[in-house]
A protein has these predicted regions:
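Phosphate/NTP-binding elements of NTP-utilizing enzymes
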Residues: 1-166
């Protein structure tokens, strides 16, 4: 999942000028040590890496003129500070949102994120990854009540040839 998320981030930022995005995970530790750390690995292999700057919390345009408008940020979510997800507007461009281990991300964060996705003529790529660890919440509803709004894939690691079954 982390490798796919990383490649998606690199694809999104490299194929559309002024892409903006937010990546979060179930915990700050997951975000920093797994999701964003995996991005570092793939960024270092990325043929266009000189066009972007990677930091511990951001991936952004190396061109100073675009560093504020062409970027993807790793932002830990907090139920006490949902506003961190409220200002994600990018009229006429692209927005990327990734929720890693999404079943543990508060419904409040999902709602605030949905409210921020109102710009017309904007390409919105919202991907959520996770395991069904809870029997309620917005992630679960991606496969139930809200399944018509999402394209879903369920992958059983027991049937994947390259997974570690130890």
């Amino acid at each position: 999942k982390s490798a796919f998320s990383s490649l998606l981030i690199l694809f999104a930022i490299a194929t559309h000028e002024n892409t903006r995005g937010v990546v979060t995970a179930n915990t700050d530790t997951q975000l920093k040590s797994k999701t964003w750390a995996e991005l570092n690995k793939w960024y270092n292999l990325f043929i266009g890496k000189e066009l972007f700057t990677y930091t511990a919390t951001s991936l952004f345009s190396a061109d100073k003129q675009y560093e504020k408008t062409w970027r993807i940020d790793a932002i830990p979510w907090s139920e006490s500070n949902p506003e961190a997800f409220a200002g994600l507007h990018n009229q006429g461009n692209r927005i990327l949102i990734i929720f890693d281990e999404a079943s543990a991300i508060s419904d409040k964060i999902w709602e605030v994120t949905e409210g921020a996705l109102t710009d017309k003529e904007t390409e919105i790529i919202w991907c959520v990854f996770g395991n069904p660890t809870r029997n309620s919440g917005r992630f679960r509803e991606c496969f139930r009540k809200h399944r018509n709004y999402w394209t879903t894939y369920q992958i059983d690691s027991r049937t994947v040839k390259i997974s570690n079954k130890a």
